[in-house]
């Protein structure tokens, strides 16, 4: 697998995964998460929050909260970029939630929730298994999602 960390100065962490696909991409995301948790979780999380505010419509509740408070771990209502593609296929009663990067989850889950996966949402050939957190019990579950 390609070495992803440590990234050189100025690297856009949210775009670093763009060159990976399939299993290699999932492994890279896991590597990114594991490295970020121990090396620079705040920097990575801040970068992803920045993606949220730039890719989601400024009027969305999640973007507004992020801009105002920098809130972590809150429920993210479906963004228009996701709703048109996958809103109907989400498991009922299982809300998406922002994931702290210190948890053992793939970056794709976080990226999808922040709309940073918009470039992949319309590519049906790229299917990934994305993990979500059940807010009620904090149990992990997954379902297939294309990004």
Swiss-Prot record:
It comes from the Eukaryota. This is Putative uncharacterized protein ADARB2-AS1. The lineage of its organism: Eukaryota, Metazoa, Chordata, Craniata, Vertebrata. It comes from Homo sapiens (Human).
